[in-house]
Amino acid sequence: TSLPAQEAFDIEYWLLEEAKLRRMPAEKELARQVVIVAGAGSGIGRETAIRLSREGAHIVAVDVSEEAAKATAAEITSRAGSGIGIAGSGLSACGPAVGLSADITDRASIRAMLDGAAIAYGGFDSICVTAGVFAPSDKSGHIPDARWASTFAVNVTGSYLVADEAAATWRDQGLKGSLVLTTSANAVVSKRGSLAYDTSKAAANHLVRELAVELAPLIRVNGVAPATVVQGSSMFPRERVIGSLAKYGLPYAESEETAVLVARLAQYYAERTLTKSPITPADQAEAYFLLVGGRLSKTTGQILAVDGGLPEAFLR
């Protein structure tokens, strides 16, 4: 008897489909993962968003500046191509990336951003919080109360609010994920001129550990602790660069290009490290990639230093 038509079709069709699948390239490491990067408009956040997207992640680029967030998302989309968008949502071209604004010191703003991420992608897997501020002392060496409060609002409370709002969604999803906060080598090194910043980063270090306990076992929580990142950082405008050069007795001229001054200061900081090389946003992005992905799936409650080797910041 002849083979039934359906059986003959099944034999030929599925063999061909399996052959096609075998010829397809392997999925990238973060394929089908949705990662929110808070602070993605510039510096470490922007570099992290781009790095994770190259590994296949869908990126929700978030910044207090909507324009900056959308610029990062547009850069990612220009490399990978746009998606079909969602009719009526206002979130068009949300294939590889979407840009949203949020103030991480405001719970309602965070909630609206997370809802926007859910509209775009149905949920999210991981969050990287790279947003931060540096508030220097005034000329007398004093830190005004408002400046102290705003430093802690962004560098500590902001990360807590993001984690607290995201926790409900993570619990509802029931899927494993990762939260990566940004601390600093300054968290363990005392010095003059950065009292509010350094103290806030010390608090952020312990926030990582506390959140790791609170969000276990579904969510791993870790921190990245950069040394001073000058190049590509929004925290180092020209005025601060010149102020730092003057503070350390390094030569400079007002007529010099900002890029030249930045490079000089970056190299000064580099000479204080064991590797003698400037710390860049790209260096930090590699750490976020490792902590978000599955390579360190048993690591939580830890601080990963990317500081070029600062002996004074070694664990005691």
Protein language model annotation of sequence segments:
Residues G41-S42:
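Conserved glycine-rich cofactor-binding loop
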Residues F124, P144-Y160, V180, Y197, ...:
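Catalytic Tyr-X3-Lys loop
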Residues S137, Y288-F289, T300-R316:
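Short C-terminal tail/terminal secondary-structure segment
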Residues D138-S140, P144-A149, Y269:
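Substrate-binding pocket helix/loop in short-chain dehydrogenase/reductase
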Residues G141, V189-L195, K276:
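Active-site loop immediately N-terminal to the catalytic Tyr-X3-Lys motif
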Residues A163, S200, V208:
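Active-site helix of classical SDR
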Residues S184:
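Residue(s) in the substrate-gating loop at a strand-loop-helix junction
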Residues A216-R220, T299-G301:
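Short, small/polar-rich loop/turn modules that mediate ligand/substrate recognition or access, typified
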